[in-house]
Amino acid sequence: MGQESTAAAAVVPAEFKLVGHKNFVRSNPMSDHFPVHRFHHVEFWCGDATNTSRRFSWGLGMPLVAKSDLSTGNSAHASYLLRSGELSFVFTAPYSPSLAEPSSASIPTFSFSDHRAFTSSHGLAVRAVAIQVDSASSAYSAAVSRGAKPVSPPVVLADCETAIAEVHLYGDTVLRFVSCGSGADGWFLPGFEVVGDGVSCQELDYGIRRLDHAVGNVPKLEPVVDYLKKFTGFHEFAEFTAEDVGTAESGLNSVVLANNNENVLFPLNEPVYGTKRKSQIQTYLDHNEGAGVQHLALITEDIFRTLREMRKRSEVGGFEFMPSPPPTYYRNLKSRAGDVLSDEQIEECEKLGILIDRDDQGTLLQIFTKPVGDRPTLFIEIIQRVGCMMKDEEGKMYQKGGCGGFGKGNFSELFKSIEEYEKMLESKLVTKTAMA
């Protein structure tokens, strides 16, 4: 556990050179090796699924909609499904292996030994990023034939239609393929029972609608980018170098991979060395004991409403946010986004600590939580994308993937905020050491 795939390390392109955001030319070769429709769900492994899921439910406005635990006949693990719009989070923790009947597990890829090693190394963390495909079996075969490291072969679930399979993504995180039969009820996977009557679901809703992107931190970009591109066929959607995003003290390099529809986005970060301070990416890798999911970006339909609801709960069981930018940031904002945001909206952005960036296609509004667990690793990003509306073949409107970019103009502010947070933690450790 905690080591990069040997398959990933063995596949090295002839040349890997980042050109930076300014020189990067975006194109979509439509090169997927198997159809990828959307993010299906994210599964977190933790020590206590009940309380962890309740904290995320309260903090993000995601009600509990389905469960698989002792009450449903599952003696292997407790899993609780939260949902808001198309966004699905699953939280899984094991029961005692000595009392469990492994065949009762609703997620057949669950492993007691893997869970124990995973949570010991990483604490609360993302175990699986699931994508919906036409056929889990076909996607798995196509991926493995192109170098993907197999984790769990295809399994057909209890409804005899839904199937899942897993391959290595990075670190101890897996990419899970999910295909649903024509009879799927849309709730989740067979073996999960629906909770409640839907009334509470309507009441607990802060406006979050889907997963926009899942960001991974890795020691080295080159082998991981090449590994993922080779077995998925995903293309490079964007890239950033330390010169694009760094501060005077630390930095990163980043590549964003996308599927054909550009609605499944996988940004990947590596640390930069030789700076005054250790890169935040390296800090993550140290505390996470290896590569893993750094943050999940969640799309909201109204970021002002979402942030008002989340901030009301920050001190009472919800999530805290990174410090807001200085007032000068917002004084300069009107010249950058005044044609998209009204004076009242810019004022609301300052009040809530929302960052704004834009590219030649659209505008991005974003904000970041502090780490959501005990370790300074995993955090959440809340975003709203404005613009880039397109018509599909049926004449329906949709928003182009990645509209407004990934906040290149805000990386500096984010890094400064994280640096100050890390300095605060370090000062506490130094004080404690001096007093010992």
From Swiss-Prot:
Pathway: Amino-acid degradation; L-phenylalanine degradation; acetoacetate and fumarate from L-phenylalanine: step 3/6; Cofactor biosynthesis; prenylquinone biosynthesis. GO terms for molecular function: 4-hydroxyphenylpyruvate dioxygenase activity; metal ion binding. Its main location: cytoplasm. The keyword Transmembrane does not apply. Gene3D superfamilies: 2,3-Dihydroxybiphenyl 1,2-Dioxygenase, domain 1 (3.10.180.10). Transmembrane segments: none annotated. Its cofactor is Fe cation. It catalyses: 3-(4-hydroxyphenyl)pyruvate + O2 = homogentisate + CO2. Disulfide bonds: none annotated. It holds the Pfam family Glyoxalase. Belongs to the 4HPPD family. This is 4-hydroxyphenylpyruvate dioxygenase. It comes from Plectranthus scutellarioides (Coleus).
